[in-house]
From Swiss-Prot:
Its EC number is 5.3.2.5. Binds 1 Mg(2+) ion per subunit. It comes from the Bacteria. HAMAP family: Salvage_MtnW. Belongs to the RuBisCO large chain family. Type IV subfamily. The modification N6-carboxylysine is found at residue 174. Its cofactor is Mg(2+). This is 2,3-diketo-5-methylthiopentyl-1-phosphate enolase. GO terms for molecular function: 2,3-diketo-5-methylthiopentyl-1-phosphate enolase activity; magnesium ion binding; ribulose-bisphosphate carboxylase activity. Mg(2+) binds at residues 174, 176-177. One of its GO terms (biological process) is L-methionine salvage from methylthioadenosine. The active site is at 99 (proton acceptor). Catalyzes the enolization of 2,3-diketo-5-methylthiopentyl-1-phosphate (DK-MTP-1-P) into 2-hydroxy-3-keto-5-methylthiopentenyl-1-phosphate (HK-MTPenyl-1-P).
Amino acid sequence: MSGIIATYLIHDDSHNLEKKAEQIALGLTIGSWTHLPHLLQEQLKQHKGNVIHVEELAEHEHTNSYLRKKVKRGIIKIEYPLLNFSPDLPAILTTTFGKLSLDGEVKLIDLTFSDELKKHFPGPKFGIDGIRNLLQVHDRPLLMSIFKGMIGRNIGYLKTQLRDQAIGGVDIVKDDEILFENALTPLTKRIVSGKEVLQSVYETYGHKTLYAVNLTGRTFDLKENAKRAVQAGADILLFNVFSYGLDVLQSLAEDDEIPVPIMAHPAVSGAYSASKLYGVSSPLLLGKLLRYAGADFSLFPSPYGSVALEKEEALAISKYLTEDDAFFKKSFSVPSAGIHPGFVPFIARDFGKDVVINAGGGIHGHPNGAQGGGKAFRAAIDATLQNKPLHEVDDINLHSALQIWGNPSHEVKL
């Protein structure tokens, strides 16, 4: 294979999956085949999409009810020749799912890149090992928290929040994805002030915390804004990838003048991936493509919290981010939304050690504030790594957290 193989979930009311697959393969490549003269067929053969797999799935009554018709469901795979497209994500996505995405009854499940094609993508600049080296933390999951309620607040408020989270033992603090450039907390001022706070905490407590600042602005201003952030001392860039596009992420990741990790936020991705019947699968969108395009971290809904993905999907995202690949470094999985300390054993069991535990309300909502919230999570992480039940841990901050949010993991075995 020198091109790309696309895997689709299709729904067909004509009940002929092979015919539908062939129509897709032709429609996204040369347009027609059987009516072409033999000589022209020979000329175009190298450009034709080839159906390589058709698998019928069991009938699904909920699908029939939603579509208001009886359909046959199937998984199909089509190989697209590298000759047909340039080696970039806009061309690849348009080739494999461009006009087909308008069908409303087809879901792009996966894309399998040839080795030749993979060479054109950067992958993470730092990856899991590089991030761990920045923090000098190699033996446990990382802990991340979020600035809360920053809109309309000034730098002083930001500094207080940041200090409390860092003292609590948080490894990374990120901006809220809806915090854009503004007069009260402009980008460079956030970075400079934040770095001062984090350096002070490090000198006093010996704990290093990184700050992920939100990279925003018009598309053609992003590189300049990113370079300003780097010059101001930014540790990590948070980026709302799907508000801009995967190719924009790639252009940032490839730029040598932006030598910092990039954290991909999933905002807007639900518009592409939420349906089970059409769109793009979450594992492909938030896993494989983000990693290939250069994200060092990928945030996605956890299977446990307030905006939950199905566990199978969340684990598939993580697999794409962390599986061995000779071409790419591994990206950190960041299962998010509604996480509190009682979920830590679940996260460690399901995602392993190389994961970022991301909490907002689970840290800020602690009765002892963000310091107490961070310490509760760190106690939960330490106990989990020792395979010790959380309710047996002698830590007042963790006990308070479990009283507020519960301990759903009390019977979890690692």
